[in-house]
Swiss-Prot record:
Pfam family, one: GFO_IDH_MocA
EC number: 3.2.1.-
Molecular function in Gene Ontology: hydrolase activity, acting on glycosyl bonds; nucleotide binding
Annotated NAD(+) binding sites: N103, R104, D125, W174, D175, F176, H177, E194, C195, N223, Y283
Presence of the UniProt keyword Protein biosynthesis in the record: no
Disordered, as annotated region: 1-35, 59-86, 463-494
Source superkingdom: Bacteria
InterPro entries: Gfo/Idh/MocA-like_OxRdtase_N (IPR000683), Gfo/Idh/MocA_oxidrdct_glycsds (IPR050463), Glyco_hydro_109_C (IPR049303), NAD(P)-bd_dom_sf (IPR036291), TAT_signal (IPR006311)
Entry protein name: Glycosyl hydrolase family 109 protein
Manner of cofactor binding, per the entry note: Binds 1 NAD(+) per subunit. The NAD(+) cannot dissociate.
Annotated family: Belongs to the Gfo/Idh/MocA family. Glycosyl hydrolase 109 subfamily.
Length: 494
C-alpha cells in the first residue's frame, strides 16, 4: 500500500548567517486576538509587544519536562501512523501559499518563484503594502496574480482552506508558528515553518500527533542543514572519514542587539520581548539541525537528555543604557534570558552535542559547526579539518581540499541565487523537488520537534540549576530504524 498522504484530507554572505527574521508570551490564539489592534503589525513581522516587560513565562515552559522514563514507553500513545519515510504525493506543479511577507517571507518568495514547477497561488499578511509588493513579484515572474489575504490576523485561515494550495510556507513571528502549522494540516496541506516550529513542549507533541493523524508533513525549514560546508561534512561523516562519531557542536552566536532595538527592522519588539520570558536557548535549530544530521539523530540514534547552564542577562540592558533614549518603550522591559546559554545533549549511543546561543553580546558570527570522531575532527568559523591519515603534527588541514565530497545539490547548483550563501535556494529547490516528484522529505515532523525541544527544555534545566531534562522520543521508537535524510541520493528525474 502506498503510504503517501492523500490528495485531499554575522558570517559573510559567502558562508551565510542562516538568520531568519520571522517572528512574542500568551497562547498563540490569544496572541492573534491581542495583536489585532497593533498598528502596522503585519504577520510578516508583527509587533506582538502586548504584555509588559514582566510578561509571564509560558506555563508549558515552566513545566516543560514530564515525569518520564528514558525510553519510548513514556511517549503518549500514537493516534495515527508514523510519518517517517512517508513520501509526498506526486504532482506536476506544486502550488504554494505563503503566510508572512516580512523580512524573511518577502525575500523567500523570490526563491519559490525561481524553482521550476512551482506556482505561488496565495499570499497572506496583514500589512497590505507588503502583500501587494509580493503579489507584484509573482506577476512579474510571469505567473497569474495570486489570491491575497490581508483582512485581519485570522485571514491566513482562508488561505489554508483553499482547494488549490498544496504546500503552506509560514514565515511569521514565533508566536504564530504552532497555530498556523496546525491550521494548515487540518486543512489538508503540507506545511513548512521557519525556526522555531513552536515554543512549547506540548505544542511540539501536538504537531507530531496532528501530522500522523492527517498524513500531512510538517517540517522545520532549517536552511543551515543545506549549507555547503554542512552538506560536505555530512557526506564525509556518513562515508566514515571521521571514524566512529563521538561528538559535535552547533550554535547560534550572532550579535543581534542593534537589530533587536531597531524600531524598523523587526517592525516591533517581538524578537526582543522573548528575552523577557525565557532563560534558555531561544534559537537552537541552526546549530542543532546540521549536527543532528551528522549523527543520524532519529535515524539510528536519538537525543535523550539536555543539560543547560546560562550566564546572567546583562547584554541587552547594557546596550539599552548606552543607545536608547529616555522614554523608549524598551525601558519597561526586564531581560531574563541568559546572554550565553550552553547546553550538552546526550544521545542514546552516548555521543555528546554542545549547543550555544548568544545574540546579546558583541562577538563575530558563528554557528561553531564542529564534528569529531575516532579518526579526526572538523571545525568551522574558520573552516579547518584534521583527520588521519591525511594530517599530522597538530597542524590543521585545508577543508577546500575535500571539495570532491560536495553534495550533489551543490554540484548542480554551484552559484545558487538568494541569500545566506545560497543555502536558502538549495533548501527550497530540494523541498519543492521532493513534493513534485513524490519523494520522502529530507526531514520531517520528528526532526522539527527534536531540533526545537531545547527551547523549553533548556529553560527548564537552567531554572533547575542545570538538572538534566529528558528529550522525548517524538518518533515513538522509529529512531532505531536507519533511513535516509539530508544526505540524499540524486533522483533520476530533475
Amino acid at each position: 500500500m502506498n503510504d503517501a498522504a492523500p490528495q485531499n484530507p554575522g558570517q559573510d554572505e559567502a558562508k551565510g548567517t542562516g538568520e531568519k527574521d520571522n517572528g512574542g508570551s500568551m497562547s498563540p490564539r490569544s496572541a492573534l486576538r491581542t495583536t489585532a489592534g497593533v498598528a502596522g503589525a503585519g504577520l510578516g513581522l508583527s509587533a506582538l509587544g502586548t504584555g509588559t516587560a514582566s510578561a509571564s513565562v509560558p506555563e508549558a515552559a515552566q513545566t516543560a519536562v514530564p515525569a518520564a522514563e528514558s525510553d519510548e514507553s513514556a511517549a503518549p500513545k500514537r493516534q495515527g501512523r508514523t510519518m517517517a519515510g512517508v513520501p509526498f504525493e506526486r504532482r506536476s506543479t506544486v502550488r504554494v501559499g505563503i503566510i508572512g511577507l516580512g523580512n524573511r517571507g518577502g525575500s523567500m518568495i523570490d526563491l519559490f518563484l525561481a524553482v521550476p514547477g512551482v506556482r505561488v497561488v496565495a499570499l497572506c499578511d496583514t500589512v497590505r503594502d507588503k502583500a501587494a509588493s509580493a503579489a507584484a513579484k509573482v506577476v512579474k515572474a510571469g505567473q497569474p496574480a495570486p489570491a491575497v489575504y490581508t483582512k485581519d490576523e485570522h485571514d491566513y485561515e482562508q488561505l489554508c482552506a483553499r482547494g488549490d494550495v498544496d504546500f503552506v510556507y509560514v514565515a511569521t513571528p514565533w508566536d504564530f508558528h504552532f497555530e498556523m502549522a496546525k491550521t494548515a494540516m487540518l486543512n489538508g496541506k503540507h506545511v513548512g515553518v521557519e525556526c522555531p516550529v513552536a515554543m512549547r513542549l506540548d505544542e511540539l507533541w501536538k504537531l507530531v500527533d496532528l501530522s500522523e493523524r492527517t498524513r500531512r508533513h510538517c517540517m522545520q525549514l532549517e536552511n543551515c542543514a543545506y549549507g555547503k560546508n554542512e552538506m560536505r561534512v555530512l557526506r564525509m561523516a556518513h562515508a566514515g572519514l571521521f571514524g566512529d562519531l563521538l561528538h559535535g557542536a552547533g550554535a547560534y552566536n550572532h550579535d543581534l542587539r542593534g537589530l533587536m532595538f531597531d524600531p524598523d527592522y523587526y517592525e516591533g519588539p517581538w524578537r526582543r520581548l522573548w528575552h523577557t520570558r525565557l532563560r534558555g536557548d531561544l534559537y537552537p535549530n541552526h546549530g542543532f539541525g546540521p549536527v543532528a544530521n551528522y549523527l543520524d539523530i532519529n535515524r539510528g540514534d536519538r537525543a535523550v537528555s539536555i543539560t543547560s547552564m546560562g550566564t546572567p542577562a546583562l547584554g541587552l540592558a547594557q546596550y539599552r543604557e548606552e543607545n536608547m533614549p529616555p522614554g523608549d518603550a524598551s525601558w519597561k522591559e526586564t531581560y531574563v534570558s541568559s546572554d550565553r546559554t550552553i547546553s550538552l545533549v546526550q544521545t542514546a549511543k552516548g555521543r555528546v552535542v554542545r549547543l550555544e546561543h548568544d545574540v546579546s553580546t558583541p562577538h563575530p558570527y558563528s554557528r561553531i559547526n564542529s564534528l569529531g570522531g575516532t579518526r579526526g575532527v572538523f571545525e568551522d568559523y574558520p573552516e579547518r579539518i584534521y583527520i588521519e591519515p591525511d594530517h599530522a603534527n597538530d597542524e590543521w588541514g585545508d577543508f577546500a581540499a575535500y571539495a570532491d565530497w560536495d553534495h550533489w545539490l551543490w554540484k548542480e547548483h554551484a552559484n545558487p541565487p538568494g541569500g545566506h550563501g545560497g543555502m536558502d535556494y538549495i533548501m527550497v529547490f530540494r523541498l519543492m523537488q521532493c513534493v513534485r516528484l513524490g519523494l520522502v522529505p529530507d526531514f520531517d515532523v520528528y526532526d522539527a520537534a527534536t531540533w526545537t525541544a531545547p527551547v523549553p527544555l533548556s529553560h527548564a534545566s537552567i531554572k533547575a540549576n542545570g538538572k538534566p531534562q529528558q528529550i522525548p522520543d517524538f518518533t515513538r521508537g522509529e529512531w532505531k530504524k536507519s533511513r535516509p535524510g539530508t544526505d540524499s541520493e540524486k533522483p533520476s528525474e530533475p
